[in-house]
Amino acid sequence: MPRAHLAAAAALALAVACKEPTVPHPLANQFRYTCCNLHYEKPEITDANYLRGTLIPFGTRIQILEVRKDSVTFKAAGHPPITLTLRDGARSLTLDQYLDRVFPPDDPYARLPKLPPDGKQAAEVDKTRRMIEEGTVSVGMTRDQVLMALGYPPADRTPSLDASTWRYWASRGDTFEISFEGDQVSRVSRQPAAPGSGRRGRRG
């Protein structure tokens, strides 16, 4: 065999030998739950977690279809496949850490406050439950209840969940803050951004 053919055959054999099979992510094809209310306008969203568009309620059972280097594609009944990309918080969290947050193995509905026997207290608890389901927050709610209602604040703006203030994006260029005293919400303040200060011109 000519030397050129031998070299080509050797190169091909080496390429085949070096190509490793793709190993699926451990979460691929698993069923999980949404930690919180998630929103989308298009089937591609990011951890910017804009609070607008179609709602996927917290506690929705989802199937994880595919996990890539910095994104996950999942499917909830009645919704198209959604690709969620870890973008802004990538310096603070690994993708696996982020997935553990947003897609827990257990239904978060079990963490909703239970209705007490007292009628007045039951009315207050029921109001809180409805606000969580509607994705709204009020003074007196706990950090865990805020997470269920709004989702996790983008990690680039709120690196630690122990912080006294969490910052969210209602939409691109429109932020608001949740302030806490201890474990409870003490204030909700809206902070529209100055003109031209929107988030990098991309939608999440």
Where are these regions (language model features)?
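Hydrophobic alpha-helical targeting segments used for export or membrane insertion
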Residues: 8-12
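C-terminal motif of bacterial Sec signal peptides marking the signal peptidase cleavage site
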Residues: 15-17
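Residues within mature, well-folded domains
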Residues: 19-204
